[in-house]
Structures are given as structure tokens and as C-alpha cells.
Amino acid sequence: MSKGHSLQDPYLNTLRKEKVGVSIYLVNGIKLQGTIESFDQFVILLKNTVSQMVYKHAISTVVPVRPIRLPSATDADGADAEPGNA
């Protein structure tokens, strides 16, 4: 996994697995809402009443409807999470 995806992939995967609703803001200001059905290196499949394939290069911001907790190596040991991952 490349260094650029070390946060992006676990973040998107947690949103997908927990079916957390998201607002995705595009670089042109358009707001899309739904749940992340799938994603790869280049696109996110966003599900609402229909599925939309959204190219990552067009995305400005991904905002979940609730806080999420990212899995980390320290969580597996039972230790406290790193600052900022609460």
C-alpha cells in the first residue's frame, strides 16, 4: 500500500463496513449524500436511491454523519488510541 493511502483506505473502509452516511463535497461545490458501497484507487461508489460512481480527483471533502473510530495497531493491544483517533 502506498504512503498516500495509509489513512484514506482505512477511513473509507470503516465508513463502508459500518454503513455510515456521508456527505461528499465535490471541487465544484456540489454536495452528494449516501453511503459508500465500494471504492478503489480512483473512484467511490456512492449509494442513495441510485448508485453513483464518483471520481476521487473530483472530491474535495468526505464528511460522515457521525464520528467514526479508525482501527489502529494500538487498539489490537488494548492500549489507548493515538491522539486524534478518538
From Swiss-Prot:
One of its GO terms (molecular function) is RNA binding. Transmembrane segments: none annotated. GO terms for biological process: regulation of DNA-templated transcription; regulation of RNA stability; regulation of translation, ncRNA-mediated. Pfam families: Hfq. InterPro entries: Hfq, LSM_dom_sf, Sm. Keywords: RNA-binding, Stress response. GO terms for cellular component: cytosol. RNA chaperone that binds small regulatory RNA (sRNAs) and mRNAs to facilitate mRNA translational regulation in response to envelope stress, environmental stress and changes in metabolite concentrations. Also binds with high specificity to tRNAs. Homohexamer. Belongs to the Hfq family. This is RNA-binding protein Hfq. It comes from Pseudomonas syringae pv. tomato (strain ATCC BAA-871 / DC3000).
